[in-house]
Amino acid sequence: MHQKTVAEISAALHAGEISSRELTDSLLKRIEQFDPRLNSLITVTAEQARAAADAADARLRAGEAGPLTGVPLVHKDIFCTDGVATTCGSRMLEPFRAPYDATVVRRLAEAGAVMLGKANMDEFAMGSSNETSYFGPVRNPWDLDAVPGGSSGGSAAAVAARLAPAATGTDTGGSIRQPAALSGICGLKPTYGRVSRYGMVAFASSLDQAGPFARTAEDLALLLGGMAGLDERDSTSVDHVVPDYSESLNRSIRGLRIGVPKEFFGEGLDADVRSRVEAALQVLEGEGAELVEVQLPNMELALPAYYVIAPAEASSNLARFDGVRFGHRCADPQDLEDLYKRSRAEGFGDEVQRRILVGTYALSAGYYDAYYRKAQQVRRLVADDFRQALDQVDVLAGPTSPTPAFDLGERADDPVQMYLSDIYTLGVNLAGLPGLSVPAGFSRGRPVGLQLIGGYFDEARLLNVGHKYQQVTDWHKQVPEGFE
């Protein structure tokens, strides 16, 4: 049953072919057996999961179940979970237990989903490889010497290894789509405001968005339906109708115009990745879609703009972790200043400290206009490029990441090379658009992802295109060796 998709598991649960408790126990055994090789989970909530599974089975017997009732999943450890550790992959929050559930956690629990545990992640979601976690790096199920992508690498690795059929993640500059691509699964970054950020520990508030991981676009449709919608506790949540995302999955894509940005196929794109993505585009063309070359002339400016805006917002958001109210507190501080300095120096890792320093500098007097304000102006140019391109076509398509998964430690000492991992994804966050990554083959045994980008609140169309692609390909059915 661990090889089944969310949709298949849901059907089996409703047909009485298996109980949620049986499925949950089976997956908990898989986690115990396989996760020591991956380190994909920080916390396993076995007792809580079994209780939730029993409650789901009662709902199923009573005929009160929905499509996610009884379906196990893991949550990225950036979402607050009542009474369960929420660490953000950091020593700073190692002792933190939230007194409430994040809206994403609450909504999925109300839908009957069963939380198996909390997934490992780059510290405070800052990273592209899941190597910055205080709890150790996550390994890629396809190659244990490779990274799974980041920052939601634990979520992606758990789904790829069949430890859970689904997971939640967050995407600030590619942190759902990039690990989905590198781990050979599907990941959706919804439109900014589509899913509540309440209870999601903030990295960069104008960029962060929660979304789901699964092995198929069909599964993502079910998960997004359970997560999306207005939340009055999140001022950035948008009151926009939530459609039945499953309803439009099987629509024909004949005549659909797919824009192919030439900037996504330039210098820096791995030749194997280019070949796999071009083959995927030909598959969509074979299904009746029309490929149209488009331009995003300011895309080369997206990376430097992002790495001003995101650290600036992070430096503000992470100022709250000071050793006074919650989180790590240094021993025997001499005075308040010593408490601040040592608690933050001990609690934050190198990459987080680097970004706090960059962000503080960008916001400082005398540099605000030269850096932060200028970056926001570039952000508008990038968003305008996407708008103009999407005025000509229905969706955009290209590679999710410029390379397949790289080796653990390969880029640890080269921040710029690490940041370039997100060069095709972070513009979508600057613009606030939805983006989807689906498996598109392999390069030297490591997965490659196809990225689809849509207009605001057009997740249904992206899922439709992704589903039609997966109906005529089988990359999503491949299983990492040793995790069968």
Swiss-Prot record:
Keyword Ubl conjugation: no
GO biological process, one term: translation
UniProt-recorded Gene Ontology molecular function terms: ATP binding; glutaminyl-tRNA synthase (glutamine-hydrolyzing) activity
One GO cellular component term noted in the UniProt record for this chain: glutamyl-tRNA(Gln) amidotransferase complex
Source organism, top-level taxon: Bacteria
Reaction equation(s) it catalyzes: L-glutamyl-tRNA(Gln) + L-glutamine + ATP + H2O = L-glutaminyl-tRNA(Gln) + L-glutamate + ADP + phosphate + H(+)
Keywords recorded for this protein, A-Z: ATP-binding, Ligase, Nucleotide-binding, Protein biosynthesis
Keyword Endoplasmic reticulum: no
UniProt EC number: 6.3.5.7
Enzyme class: ligase
Active site: residue positions: 76, 151, 175
Subunit structure: Heterotrimer of A, B and C subunits.
Family annotation (HAMAP family): GatA
Function according to Swiss-Prot or TrEMBL: Allows the formation of correctly charged Gln-tRNA(Gln) through the transamidation of misacylated Glu-tRNA(Gln) in organisms which lack glutaminyl-tRNA synthetase. The reaction takes place in the presence of glutamine and ATP through an activated gamma-phospho-Glu-tRNA(Gln).
Family under the similarity heading: Belongs to the amidase family. GatA subfamily.
Protein name as it appears in the record: Glutamyl-tRNA(Gln) amidotransferase subunit A
Species of the source: Halorhodospira halophila (strain DSM 244 / SL1) (Ectothiorhodospira halophila (strain DSM 244 / SL1))
